[in-house]
Curated annotation (Swiss-Prot):
Primary location group: cytoplasm
Residues noted as binding DNA in the record, renumbered to the chain: R315, R320
Comment field on protein domains: Has 3 domains, the large (RuvB-L) and small ATPase (RuvB-S) domains and the C-terminal head (RuvB-H) domain. The head domain binds DNA, while the ATPase domains jointly bind ATP, ADP or are empty depending on the state of the subunit in the translocation cycle. During a single DNA translocation step the structure of each domain remains the same, but their relative positions change.
Family from the record: Belongs to the RuvB family.
Function: The RuvA-RuvB-RuvC complex processes Holliday junction (HJ) DNA during genetic recombination and DNA repair, while the RuvA-RuvB complex plays an important role in the rescue of blocked DNA replication forks via replication fork reversal (RFR). RuvA specifically binds to HJ cruciform DNA, conferring on it an open structure. The RuvB hexamer acts as an ATP-dependent pump, pulling dsDNA into and through the RuvAB complex. RuvB forms 2 homohexamers on either side of HJ DNA bound by 1 or 2 RuvA tetramers; 4 subunits per hexamer contact DNA at a time.
Official protein name in the record: Holliday junction branch migration complex subunit RuvB
PANTHER family listed in its UniProt record: HOLLIDAY JUNCTION BRANCH MIGRATION COMPLEX SUBUNIT RUVB (PTHR42848:SF1), PTHR42848
Species of provenance: Porphyromonas gingivalis (strain ATCC BAA-308 / W83)
Location of the region described as Head domain (RuvB-H) in the Swiss-Prot/TrEMBL record: 260-343
Amino acid sequence: MTEEFDIRQERYRGNDGEREVENKLRPLTFDSFSGQDKVVENLSIFVAAARLRGEALDHTLLHGPPGLGKTTLSNIIANELGVGLKITSGPVLDKPGDLAGLLSSLESNDVLFIDEIHRLSPVVEEYLYSAMEDYRIDIMLDKGPSARSIQINLSPFTLVGATTRSGLLTAPLRARFGINLHLEYYDVHTITGIVERSARILEVSCSHDAAVEIAGRSRGTPRIANALLRRVRDFAQVKGSGAIDKPIACYALEALNIDRYGLDNVDHKLLATIIDKFAGGPVGLSTIATALGEDPGTIEEVYEPFLIKEGFLKRTPRGREVTELAYTHLGRNPRPHRPSLFD
C-alpha cells in the first residue's frame, strides 16, 4: 500500500525543489488566502486587535484534515503581526530541553508553530503549560539529592498549534488555547480559483476547464490541488504543447489513477479490501490496517475523513462499513440487505 502513488503524501516525499515550489504557492496575507472565510475573517480581527494593543496574539489552535492551510495560516499570522516565526512539530520535541531552547530563542510577540501538536510527549507538554500561561519554564538540573530547579523567563509569544486529530489533545492543553478554529474541506469553485492562481505563479497556461477538472479531483484540499497541478504540468510539457487544457488534464489524472471523485489506488484498495475480505463490514480499524499493511493512525487520519465525507465509508459502533455508493463506484453488486432484529 505504501508503494502506491499517493498524492496526499507528496508534501513529505518531495525534494527541496518541490518544497520550494510549494512555499512559492503559499499566500502571504489574509487577503490572498482563498476559502475558510469565517476562519480568516475571525483571525484577521484577532490579529488586528493584538497588533493595535501591541500584545501577543492569544494562543491559537487550528484543527482539521491535512492540507487545508494550517501551516499557511501560521505564516500569515506572523506576517500580519510583523513578528518572527519558528516552526517545529510535536514528534521533534523529544525532551524538555528541546522546548526550552526553542522558547528562549523567541523574541517579544513572536509566533511558535507546532505541527502535529497532538503528538507531543507528556513530559514536554507539561513544560508547555507554564510557558503558555505565565511565559516561564522551570527546568530541573541534576537528579537525586542534588537536584535543583531553575526558572527561565520568556518573552510573550503566541503558540499556534495544528492538529488533524483534535480529539487526541489532552483537556489541560486544549484549555490553554484562547482561539480554537476548525478548517473545513474546500468547495470546487474555491479550489478552481486556487489552481488558476497557482498556474499563474508557475507561469503555465491553464484553461478554466482544465482547472475545474483538477479541482474536482483534489478532494477539497489545496495541497492536493497544487500537487496535481504540478504533475499535470509535467504531462503537458512532455505529452502536449506545454499548455494545460482539459484533454491533457484528464489524460494526466487518469494516468495517475485519480478518478472523478478524487479517489486514488489507495482509496480503491481500502474499500475493496473491506468488500472482498470482510463482506463490506463492519470491521475494526486495526483489522483493516493489518490487511493493508498500514498504520491504523494513518488510515484514520489521512484516508478515512474524505471517504466518510463523500459517503463511501461510514463508522458504526461495530467498526467501519462501506456504503452502497462504494459498491457502485467499484463496479460491484451491492450486498443483500441484512435483516436486523427489528425487521
